[in-house]
Amino acid sequence: QIERMANKMDLVILPIQGVSDDGFIELKKRGYCMKDFFASLRKETLIFTGVITPYIKKLPQTVISLLAREEVVAANAALTAEGILAMVIQNTPRSLPEYRYDVIGFGHCGRAIAGLFHQLGLEVRIVSAHAHPESAQLPYSFIRLQEWQFQQPWPVVINTAPAEVISEAMVAGWQTQPLIIDIASRAVGVSERVYKRKDTHVI
C-alpha cells in the first residue's frame, strides 16, 4: 500500500540506520523491502536519513544525512546515553555504584555514555581498538580491545562499536556473565550465538 502513495510524497524520513545494500529497512526487528517504494518516488522528493548507505547513494532523489550535522550527532549521543542509563537501572538488581562499567568504542556515543556515567560517580573503563592520545587527561581507565577480549569483563558491558567484538568463545570463557547492552548499528557487536545462550543477558 505504501508504494501507491510514494509518488505523492514530498518528504521521506528513514530510520537512523538508513537502507541496507539490498534495499531493506529494519523496523522493530523486522525487515521490509523498499525497492518498489523508492522506484515510485518522484525525483523531487527529499529523503532524510541518518546513515547514507551505498543503496541510498544510488537514488536520484536529494538525500540529507542528519548524522552529518554535528549538533544532531551530539544531541543523539546525549539521548542515547540517557537511554542506556535507564536500561541499566531496569535490568540490574542493585544500585548503580555497586557495578563497574565497560564501554566499548570511543566515538560520539561511547564518549557520551562514559561522560554521563562518570558524572554520576560510576567507575567506567573505555575499551577501544585504537589508542587515544588524550586518554591520560580523561577520568576513565583505558584498555585495548585486543587485551580486553582475553579478560573477564566488568559487570556491565555497553558496546557502541559497529563490529563484532563479543564472540561465543569469549563468553564461554567468562567466569561470571555480565549484563551486555549492544547499541551498535544493526546490533552487530555481539555474535548471534551469544544471544541464544541461556546463561547470558544481552539487550
Predicted feature locations:
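Hydrophobic anchor at the start of a short beta-strand
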Residues: 63, 124, 178
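Residues in the short beta-alpha loop(s) of Rossmann-like NAD(P)-binding domains
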Residues: 53, 107, 129-131, 184-186
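Glycine-rich adenosine-cofactor-binding loop
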Residues: 1, 95-118
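Rossmann-like adenosine-cofactor binding region
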Residues: 17-21, 32-41, 136-203
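NAD(P)-binding Rossmann-fold cofactor-contacting core
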Residues: 1, 120-138
